[in-house]
Structure formats: structure tokens, C-alpha cells
């Protein structure tokens, strides 16, 4: 599959559905999460890989590269 992976810092529990950061590497996402945690967002965030890559969209389960 082509395209750059996207790593996200997302909220959990009451903040589920909120994306706080989108990063090009897992390490950068972890750094973003650390900064967020230092600013009051402890224990409510997770780092995860996006189901899409950069410049992709999904329609009815089909991935389309832009």
C-alpha cells in the first residue's frame, strides 16, 4: 500500500472521537501526547495508527489514492 502512515493522538472515554494531533511517525505522536499530558490531559489519550494513509479516502470500504 502506498502513502505515508498517519499516527494520531486521540481522546478516550469522554473525549472519544477527538483527535488532538496527526503525525508522520509514532515517535512524533508519542511526543505530542507527552506535551498534551504535561498540559492537563493525563490518562485520557492514546496513540494509534490511522486506518487511512496520507492522501487517501475511503468510500464504501474501498480505498482511493488521491
Regions found by a protein language model. Give the residues of each.
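Short aromatic-glycine-(Arg/Gly/Cys) micro-motifs in beta-strand/loop hairpins
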Residues: 1-19
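A short, charged, amphipathic alpha-helix used as a generic interaction element across diverse proteins
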Residues: 13-15, 23-45
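Short, mixed-charge low-complexity intrinsically disordered segments
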Residues: 35-66
Amino acid at each position: 500500500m502506498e502513502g505515508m502512515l498517519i499516527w494520531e493522538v486521540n481522546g478516550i472515554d469522554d473525549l472519544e472521537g477527538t483527535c488532538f494531533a496527526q503525525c508522520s511517525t509514532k515517535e512524533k505522536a508519542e511526543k505530542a501526547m507527552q506535551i498534551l499530558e504535561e498540559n492537563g490531559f493525563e490518562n485520557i489519550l492514546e496513540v494509534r495508527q490511522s486506518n487511512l494513509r496520507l492522501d487517501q479516502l475511503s468510500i464504501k470500504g474501498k480505498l482511493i489514492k488521491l
